[in-house]
């Protein structure tokens, strides 16, 4: 029986690692990128198109206007306003990290995205939803936790006609571990985008990261500490 997977692809290190991992594990892989009006949407779509061609994987981009509207109601800085700037030291402060997480929170995003992926897989006959949830982000984003995955899979038993489950291959890893996995998989991570406020692309197609948002700092710190290098292009090199 053919093993099928849908990779929820947001363009960053986590989903890029998941994509390369899934390509080795499954017979059929589909990338699913969801647009909801975020600041980095244009860059995310181009990154998704790049990896779709690079790995010869089918890409589906879904637009969810209602999620943009709900995010605007909530006042999420990911769809408007200024994204918080943080330092590596501030990321170690749970209160400060939680404050930043609240600023960029998209209402029930992961639940909504997984529902979309589950619907697609149910229509195709079932399969696995591959998500980039990891131990580091689970400390500030509860919808990245192992418990969340377990509860989702309990619900999916009742929600789909065909068997669908969530698989989180990075669930025990921090950014350093993810960096090491990317290197093992020979992933072209420099073409991925983690930035909440990207500045466009280089001539060879690499996203230009702001270097100041939480996601940029986590990315740079993880790569340097994990594999001793960072090929990412930054407008301002993050201070770690």
Swiss-Prot record:
Annotated metabolic or biological route of this protein: Purine metabolism; 7-cyano-7-deazaguanine biosynthesis
A molecular function GO annotation: ATP binding
Keywords for the protein's UniProt record, in alphabetical order: ATP-binding, Ligase, Metal-binding, Nucleotide-binding, Zinc
Cofactor(s) annotated in UniProt: Zn(2+)
Cofactor comment text: Binds 1 zinc ion per subunit.
CDD domains hit by this protein: QueC-like
Entries under InterPro entries matching the protein: QueC, Rossmann-like_a/b/a_fold
Catalytic activity from the UniProt record: 7-carboxy-7-deazaguanine + NH4(+) + ATP = 7-cyano-7-deazaguanine + ADP + phosphate + H2O + H(+)
Binding site residues for Zn(2+): 195, 210, 213, 216
Record flagged with keyword Zinc: yes
Pfam families assigned: QueC (PF06508)
UniProt EC number: 6.3.4.20
Name of the top EC class for this enzyme: ligase
Residues annotated for ATP binding in this entry: 9-19
Protein's UniProt keywords contain Zinc: yes
Record's function text: Catalyzes the ATP-dependent conversion of 7-carboxy-7-deazaguanine (CDG) to 7-cyano-7-deazaguanine (preQ(0)).
NCBIfam families documented for this protein: 7-cyano-7-deazaguanine synthase QueC
Family: Belongs to the QueC family.
Name of this protein: 7-cyano-7-deazaguanine synthase
Lineage: Archaea, Methanobacteriati, Methanobacteriota, Thermococci, Thermococcales
Gene coding for it: queC
């Amino acid at each position: 029986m053919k093993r099928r997977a849908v990779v929820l692809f947001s363009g960053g290190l986590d989903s890029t690692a998941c994509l390369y991992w899934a390509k080795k594990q499954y017979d059929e892989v589909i990338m699913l990128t969801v647009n909801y009006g975020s600041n980095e949407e244009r860059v995310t779509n181009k990154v998704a198109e790049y990896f779709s061609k690079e790995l010869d994987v089918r890409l589906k981009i879904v637009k969810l206007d209602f999620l943009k509207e709900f995010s605007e109601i909530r006042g999420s800085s990911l769809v408007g306003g200024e994204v918080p700037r943080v330092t590596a030291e501030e990321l170690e402060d749970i209160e400060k990290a939680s404050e930043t997480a609240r600023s960029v929170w998209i209402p029930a995003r992961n639940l909504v995205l997984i529902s979309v992926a589950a619907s697609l897989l149910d229509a195709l006959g079932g399969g696995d939803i591959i998500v980039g949830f990891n131990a580091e982000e689970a400390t500030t984003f509860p919808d990245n936790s192992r418990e969340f995955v377990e509860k989702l899979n309990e619900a999916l038993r009742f929600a789909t006609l065909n068997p669908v489950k969530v698989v989180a291959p990075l669930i025990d890893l921090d950014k350093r571990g993810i960096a090491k996995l990317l290197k093992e998989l020979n992933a072209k991570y420099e073409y991925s985008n983690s930035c909440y406020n990207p500045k466009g692309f280089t001539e060879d197609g690499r996203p230009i990261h702001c270097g100041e948002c939480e996601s940029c700092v986590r990315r740079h710190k993880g790569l340097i500490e994990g594999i001793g290098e960072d090929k990412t292009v930054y407008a301002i090199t993050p201070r770690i």
